[in-house]
Amino acid sequence: MGAIGLMLGLQNQVAQNPFGDSSISWIMNILFYAVFVVFMFYGQRIQMMVMLREVEGSLHKLKYIKEEGRKTAVETVKEIGKPQADPAARIDRFLEYFTIGPQGLDPAGIVWKLEHILDVRDTRFKDEVKLMAPSADEIQANNLENTLEAAMALNYIYKIIRHFYLLGKKTYSLYVVMQIQMILPMVMKEAEAYASALKAFAFGQPIGDGAGALVAAKLMQGHETRKIAKDCVVATVPFEGRTAFVIKAEGPGGNVGKPGDAIKEVIDENNGNVATVVMIDAALKLEGEELGEVAEGVGAAIGGPGVDQYKIEESLVKYHIPINAVIIKEDVGDAVSPLRKEIFDSVENVIERVRQVVLERTKEGDKVIIAGIGNTIGIGQ
């Protein structure tokens, strides 16, 4: 409505000078009514054209980020995997993979159906990486898998935004365009985070999501570890007069493991004789909260589709074991970007919080489980 405001101002000036040129007054009046009529009948269309222009600009940026992600994935596979043939075509096919969730009309047993689908997906991805990069070792293969998944996420984000942009342009529906335009800032922030994650995965650098795994790695440092469950390790560590079973995903490759199975197995090995479980994980911070801020509470601190959380809660209920949680607050971008100093510096604070929880909630001689949750890329045992 800026043009209408301008015309009103000019009209007022003319009205204040009644002895001015009458032709100028007529021109101003005609222009004012012309602009008013245009905005009355075509205001919504003009507004939509402005929105489409904004979405189009973001779409071009998303396309560039997506193409750079694909390029990084191809170059990393070539450098590490040393394939005989060009992997670009297979990578393009990989980027279009999808996963169909289980039918939820009958919820009984849906967790096991979901776990089966996720296991099949994980196996398929690992097989694809082996075919693309035959020379990669296990750690490199895990990092490549994470790299490709980040590139896949960027490809998916771009296609969704493009879909609504073209749909809005085709139907000329203000509400279709308005919806996508309103969430664009958050979408762009997420896309830029995945772009940062691509480089971290390609170079095997720790990421913000690995904060929990980093705490566990510090606690188990210098102690013998053993494999437990899939892609998980556990170390028996003396901790403030208690016996602590410290669990994390097996690093330093990009892994999250199956902490649900690992915690269940340790509980079963000790016949439920566990005083408490303490879970450590990164959590989404709210605007205004400090990066790396530490908080504690109760419950299974673990993200993902829910399979591991379900298994942990089932084991805890079976033996009536209390569960405590310590979280490190991060932005969504920090979680998948290279580990920031503020998050790294918070690790000692987290260990101190865990120490307080163990001292206050258990007694000497008790057994406790401390589980560091998160992607352990770049973090060893």
What are these regions (language model features)?
Residues M1-S23:
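Short, strongly hydrophobic alpha-helical membrane anchors
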Residues W26-Q44, G212, A216:
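Alpha-helical membrane-embedded segments
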Residues R45-M49:
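Membrane-interface capping segments at transmembrane-helix boundaries
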Residues V50-L214, K218-M220:
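Electropositive, gly/pro-rich neighborhoods at or near active sites that engage anionic ligands
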Residues I160-P338, F344, G374-Q381:
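Conserved mixed alpha/beta catalytic, RNA-binding, or beta-rich assembly cores of soluble enzyme
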Residues A275, D366-V368:
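Conserved acidic residues
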Residues V347-T362:
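A short, acidic, amphipathic alpha-helical segment used as a generic capping/interface helix at domain edges
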Residues A371:
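Short beta-strand immediately N-terminal to the catalytic nucleophile in serine-hydrolase-like folds
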